[in-house]
Amino acid sequence: MQIKSFLLPIVAALLTSVSAADSSNKCSFSKTSITEATAITQLNACSTLDGEITVSGSGIGSIDLSSVKVLKAKLSILNSPSIVSLNFNQLQNITGALVINNATQLNSIDLTQLTNVETLQLVSLPSFAILNLNQGVQKAGTIVLSDTALTNLNGLASFNTIDSININNNKNISKIEFNDLQTVTDSLILSFNNDDAEVKLDSLKWAGNLTIQDVSSIQASNLTSVNGSLLISYNTFDELEFPNLKSVGNSMQIFAHDELTKISFPKLSELDGELEMFNNTQLEEIDFGNLTTIKGAVTISGPFDNLTMENLKLVSGDFQVNSTSDKFDCSAFDKLHEKGKIEGHNYVCTHPANPSSSSKSGSSTQTGKSDSKSSDGSSSSNSSSSSKKGASNVLVVPGMVLTTALGVLLALI
């Protein structure tokens, strides 16, 4: 009893202290929902916002949070068709998240002082054309920019390291340049912006995953490693080259190009996943001259004449190469298969017969299996030569015909 009487005042004091701390921290909001403009004033009284705050509905025309310097909270502005502008002109650090989604009338966002961002998502903002980022973001975690009316990335391209960045479906952005970006630890996605978008990633050295879609050009001259997957599709350039890329840690897919004629990865030595290329309708040349190992399946189809893999030593999966060019040659891959260096259960290498060989063998398709080609060719040539010999052994002389006819006539008489 004495112990209880001794502890009770202490516990009461502690509870009072915690309660006082909570009541005094007016800038920490736990799952707070705001639908009216008057509630924005309370937020703007804070230099630091913490907690989880959601602004939604059509009761707010503009948001002024010009007193906020640090955003520790996750601040979400969702489904707000009436908001036309956001003012965060003193905000320097976002250590939480700023998420703006489906604000159809939003035209401008002022982030003049912003330099550090953990998470910034600007999605489904079809009227959003003005982004003020005078200082430029120097440090970033995750940035998503999707379906906006922005014409450039000024201020969003100054960082040298980022976890992930996804820029997609911004139809007015025709230039995407990250001149300082060296490392993307998770993923870099640049997809379906302006059809003529030009991409420059000349400082990029390492990426977790890389996706490039619907661009007119791509420069990544210093990229040496993609730790995950590399996906290239639906672009309009005629040549694709990664001159210094040495390794890809997962799959590589290149597909759906109508103008692409040449693919070159001259220093790529190891691919730790599948290699897949298809629907590249004008493709003529593929260069993987330094590639030694593919730790997955190979599926390549198209009109290419040359597929250079002269240093290839091992394919861990199935192998299927189908060229529609009669200039293509399967012999190098046939030899690799015969040595057991293509470890998958299925091996196919096809191309139309070369006109010169088809005249001899009569075969329209070569499978890359030397046995079937040589037997077909030899049997055709043997039958052809034997028919010629049979015809040459019959010699008809006109005098012999006349003598025979007279003998028959005299016998009848």
Curated annotation (Swiss-Prot):
Q: Which stretches does UniProt call biased (Low complexity)? A: 356-390
Could you name the domain of life of the organism this protein comes from? Eukaryota
- GO term, biological process aspect, one: cell wall organization
Q: What does this protein do?
A: Cell surface protein required for proper cell wall integrity and for the correct assembly of the mannoprotein outer layer of the cell wall.
| Inducing factors | Expression is induced by growth in hypoxic conditions and by caspofungin and ketoconazole. Expression is negatively regulated by BCR1, HOG1, PLC1, RIM101, SSN6, and SUR7.
Q: Give compartment(s).
A: Cell membrane; Secreted, Cell wall
* A GO term from the CC aspect: cell surface
Record-given protein name: Cell surface GPI-anchored protein ECM33
Similarity-based family: Belongs to the SPS2 family.
Q: Which SUPFAM superfamilies match?
A: L domain-like
Chain residues carrying a lipid of type GPI-anchor amidated glycine = 390
Give the record's glycosylation annotations as residue positions.
Answer: 93, 102, 172, 209, 222, 227, 279, 290, 306, 322, 382
InterPro entries given for it?
CWI-Assembly_Regulator (IPR051648), Rcpt_L-dom_sf (IPR036941)
Does this entry carry the keyword Lipoprotein? yes
What are the transmembrane regions?
Answer: none
Which keywords belong to this entry? Cell membrane, Cell wall, Cell wall biogenesis/degradation, Glycoprotein, GPI-anchor, Lipoprotein, Membrane, Secreted, Signal
Q: Which organism is it from?
A: Candida albicans (strain SC5314 / ATCC MYA-2876) (Yeast)
Query: Where does the UniProt annotation place the signal sequence?
Result: 1-20
The record's region (Disordered) falls at: 347-390
**Topologically, how does it sit relative to the membrane?**
Lipid-anchor; GPI-anchor
Q: Which residues form the propeptide?
A: 391-413
